[in-house]
Amino acid sequence: AFYPILIGLGAVGYMLWKDFDIQVFSGITFSWHMVFWLVMAVVFMFGRDIGYIIRIRILSNNQLSWRQAFRVIMLWEFTSAITPSAVGGTSVAIIYVHKEGISVGRSSAIVMLTSFLDELYFIVMFPLLILIVGPSELFDVSTSSGVLTRSLMGIALTGYFLKLGFVLVLSYGLFVNPRGLKWLLLKVFKLKFLRRWYHAAGQTGTDIIRSSHEIRRYNYKFWLKACSSTFLSWSSRYLVANALIMAFFAVSDQFLLFARQLVIW
C-alpha cells in the first residue's frame, strides 16, 4: 500500500516543482492565521481517510485489521485518482477487499454498501444545506441573471432526484427483493441499445443478491456506526477546501462554501 502513496507523492512533487513560480508566492503574506488553516486542511485530509478506514472495518465486522483496512483504502483511493471518473476505484475495490481474505460475496456486499452510504450522505445533506443556506444564496452568482440561477437550481435538483432514484432502487434490491431487481435489470438491458452491457447488468444483479444476504443480518448499531463514519469521511473531504480558502481569504459563510462543494459533487 506504500507504493501507491510514494508514486502519488512523487507525481505531486514533480508537478509542484515543474510549475513553481516564485513571483506568485511573493504576493502572499504568511501569518499564523494561514499556518493554522493549512494545518487544519491536513487534519481534515487525515479525517477523510480515517473515516473511510473506520467504515470499511465496520462493514467487514472488524474482520479487516487496521493495517488491512488502511491498505485497502489507500489502494482504493489511488485507483480512483488514476482512473477515469466513469470507472473509478469501485470496480476493482472488490478485488482489494477479497485479497485481504474476505469472500467474494462479502466483498461485494462491503463495496455495494460503501456506494449506498456515499449516495445516502448526499441525499440527506443536500436538503439540509438548502434549508440552512437557502436556494437563492446557494445558486446565486454575482454576474448571473435570475434565469441562470434558476437553471443552476434545476440542474442540481435533477442530479439530486437521479441520485435519490438510484438509492431507492438499490434499497429495494438490497433490503426487499434482490432477485426481483436482478430480473428487472436483465429485462431493461435486453433492449437493443443496452444489450452490450447485458452481462455486466447480470453480474451487478448477482452482486446485489449476495450483498442482500449479508446486509439483512445487520442491526441498528451497525448502521449508526456506518453512517457516522461516512459522515466523518465526506464532511472532512469537503472541509479541506473550506480550510484552504480560509487560509488565504476572509470568508464568513462556511456553510455556503460547504454546500456549494456538495452541489458540485
Predicted segment positions?
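Transmembrane helix boundary and interhelical junction motifs in multipass membrane proteins
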Residues: 48-56, 85-94
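Helix-loop junctions at the membrane interface of multi-pass solute transporters
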Residues: 57-61, 81, 93-102, 231
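Transmembrane alpha-helix termini and helix-breaking/packing motifs in multi-pass membrane transporters
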Residues: 126-143
